[in-house]
Regions:
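Core catalytic alpha/beta fold that binds nucleotide/phospho-ligands
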Residues: 1-144
Length: 144
C-alpha cells in the first residue's frame, strides 16, 4: 500500500493511534518533503521515502531520523542538525525543516556581536579622547 511504501512501521503505528490518522500521515509526508528540500534534493538522487523518518521524543516533540541515501547526503553536506516544526488543522498540514551545517555554525560563531563591537569601539574612542585631553589638563594644572 502507499502507506507501507512511504512510512516506517513506527510512523504508521503512531498515525494509526491518533483520532485523525489522515492528518498525521499528511503532516509526516509534509515533514519528509521539508527535510529533503532543506537538504536540496527532494525525492531524487536515490533517496527513498523510508530514508526520512519522523519520530517523537518522550515529550511528543517531532524529530528526524535519516537513513540510507538521505543520511549519506546529509553527511556529505556536513549537516549537524535538522530541526523540524510541524503544524496541522483538520484540512491542512505544514512542516518546516532547516539543515544546519557545520559551516553555518562556524560562521555564526565567528560573526561579531554588534553590541560587543560597539562597546569595544566606544572604549577605544574614550581612551583616545582621554589621551588627547591629558596634555591639556597637565598644562592647566597649577602644580606644573
Amino acid at each position: 500500500s502507499f502507506r507501507e511504501k512511504v512510512f516506517s512501521e513506527e510512523e504508521r503505528s503512531y498515525c494509526e493511534s491518533t483520532a485523525n490518522p489522515e492528518v498525521h500521515y499528511a503532516t509526516r509526508f509534509a515533514a519528509k518533503e521539508a527535510v529533503l528540500k532543506a537538504l536540496g534534493t527532494g525525492f531524487s538522487r536515490g533517496i527513498a521515502n523510508h530514508d526520512v523518518e519522523v519520530r517523537r521524543n518522550a515529550k511528543g516533540r517531532p524529530f528526524v531520523v535519516l537513513h540510507g541515501r538521505a543520511k549519506e547526503v546529509a553527511d556529505e553536506q556536513g549537516v549537524r542538525e535538522l530541526p523540524l516544526s510541524l503544524s496541522y488543522t483538520h484540512t491542512d498540514a505544514v512542516a518546516c525543516a532547516l539543515a544546519i551545517t557545520e559551516e553555518s555554525v562556524r560562521a555564526q560563531e565567528e560573526r561579531v556581536n554588534p553590541m560587543e563591537e560597539l562597546a569595544k569601539q566606544f572604549k577605544e574612542a574614550r581612551s583616545l579622547l582621554d589621551e588627547m585631553d591629558a596634555p591639556k589638563k597637565a598644562s592647566e594644572d597649577p602644580a606644573n
